Amino acid sequence: MHGRKRKGAAVVGLLAIVSLAIAATALARVDAPAATAAPNVGCDNPTIGFQGPITGDAAFIGKEQLGFAQYAIRKLGGGTIKLLQQDTQLDPAQASTTGTKLHADANVLAVVGPAGSQEVLAVAPIYRKAQRLPFISGSATRTSLTNGSIPNFFRVVPNDSVQAPTTAKYIRQVLKANEVFIVDDQTAYSRPLANGVQANLKAGGVKVTRNSVNQKVTDFSSLVSKIGDGVDVVYLPWQIAANGQIFGQQMKEQGKSAIIVGSDGLDSGDFKIQGSYVVAFAPDIRGIKGNAAFIRGYGKKFVSNFGPPMYVATQAAIAAIKKACADGNATRAEVQRQLKATFLPKIVLGGNLQFTARGDVKGAKFYIFKLGAGGKKTLVG
């Protein structure tokens, strides 16, 4: 009997302890403050990264792109969205280094740039990592960039599957060329574009001679000497406009009379060979009705078509970030989702901005300009 009493007392004591513990837990639940949602950090200091060649041989591209990106921030950012600029020098290695910095900054919700297709290929693996970072180029045209392998990539200019046939058709039907001399600059941008133009020309019965030169080369005299007397057009799908200018000058020195047709990379004040042509991925916005106030607001001189598309790219990023913040979900994933749903009416490039499922711009086209004295451009196609 005594042992049973002890056991009974122990059980009663244990039950009492358990009851007290449950009561304490219940009180703690009542007294503890309610859990709060994770703070919307991205909207505290929302930032757009900028990547472009601010220095180096292609600095004209980066400076104009940066100027228009800054203009978009001033005009549309509402004083809250910042721009963090990084110089790539049109170099894939430098693009990777600066891209790593942007990806590591939690405040960066989107990137505008890089400028070159080879740079896009360099940063794509970085921006695809955890905390995937959406990015929008204002000038990279390599067709394969939007084949689905880079789902967080967008561009506001048409790709080279449009540029190649547009260029070849003009060379064949308008310039009436029977023989074309093509020189690529050995980059991820130039080679595929040269291939596309070459294929289209050959399909139209045009004789094509193909050559290649490294982008770092600046003396083309030996290459120019290979241009035969029967060549009507020299096609240069290059990114460094100053190199195109040197090439054209050396053609004149050697008495070569073929017409130069340059790709969008030669659409710059650095290339001004009279009588030449450049193919551009954007119109001259000065010729679009309703843009006068916008151009006055920019307040700087611009000589190429590289700047305005970067304004549009930044405009799209700003709109996506604002919508993500309004939804209380300022994450990179939400910004990417908003970019996919982009609809911007009456942009400065003309028309509306929408993206395809793979990030290409809908309905864009290439334009052809003829260069007059001093490089003055006239729209011809």
What residue spans do the PLM features occupy?
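Extracytosolic ligand-binding ectodomains
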Residues: 2-15, 21-381
